Amino acid sequence: MKRVAYILVSIVLLAAMVGCDSFRSLTGAKKTAQGSPYEVLVVCDGYEWESQLGTELKAVLETPVEMLNQVEPMFNVVRITARDFKHLLPSYRNILKVLCSPQVAETSIVAQYDVVASPQIVLTFQGPSIAAMVEYLKQNGSALLQVLEIAERNRTIEYAKKQGARALEKIIKEEFDIDMHISNGYLFRAESDDFVWASNEYPVASQGFFIYSHPFKGKASVTTESLVKARNEFAKRIPGPTDGSYMTTVKRIPNVEDDGYVDFMPQRKVVKINGRDWIELRGFWEVERDFMGGPFVSYTTLDEREGELLTIDCYVYSPKYGKRNFLRPLEHLVYGVSFPANDK
């Protein structure tokens, strides 16, 4: 835990570190950061990149995203040499600079934010030897991913605060008495006394979420089976493309060992977000009586004010393209939720 905290809070002047600092000569106003979401520019010279260090670094950054229909990495890696970086790409949104030198006393990862562009995170990973840096990655790889994920999440939330879907936020506030920050592009689709559905439609994809509440009746209400049952009841309100079709939760998946199917339940864990416990479910959805489907992630918490369970359920449909960059911003929605009556 101390290692995670160190990476999260350590901010140092890169000019004080060993080696050339390509930022020192750059002055002036901040530029808009370049690069795509979930893309990391790794500044690493050839010897280190071709060594076990480069192999381990790629393995960490390209860790598969859990519970997607196909394999997608946590981050796409773009590698560049220090020389090319200095002249071409110092304003990238996510930068990881690699420095291996015997002059470095201790292996560490340190962070700076908005160095020459905004929003930007610049991580410097340094150590005295390749072996020491590889071992550090084995121990702290998940923390490195966490820091980069938090940077992406904060960008989503800040953008929603500035460019929000205010009309939709108002509908949700009136229905559930919660505050949310929702980016422009999401449009209201349907509502009832205990349900709101919104989506962002693209020519080749759909990015949507629905919020619903239902009575809390003790521990039996929050078993995985009960949560999936509740999900299916509300998902029926999301129509499919043909008459009588509707969304539901996948219950069986192909067996990789033969041509049959096996029973499947969404993955479950409890996460604490802004001091509140949420039950996270990750699984797959499909359309009853039609051929559509994709990944979903839902977050359920107890709204003590009403004695009800509140769920934010996020789904993606993207049959031709990757799903990571559609699903991640939906996951970020829950980090912008607040319960005003509980905060008084």
Residue ranges and their predicted role:
Residues D177-D194, L333-F339:
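Short conserved aromatic/hydrophobic patches within beta-strands of well-structured domains
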Residues S25-T27, L41-D45, S183-M247:
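Secretory pathway targeting signatures of secreted, lumenal, and periplasmic proteins
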Residues A15-G19:
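C-terminal motif of bacterial Sec signal peptides marking the signal peptidase cleavage site
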Residues Q120-A132, G208-H214, E308-Y317:
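Short, well-ordered beta-strand elements
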Residues V134-E158, Y186, G307-K344:
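Surface-exposed amphipathic alpha-helical segments
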Residues M1-L8:
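Bacterial N-terminal signal peptides that target proteins for export
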Residues I80-A132, P239-E306:
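Signature of long, low-cysteine stretches enriched in small and polar/charged residues
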Residues R24-Q120:
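Start-of-domain marker
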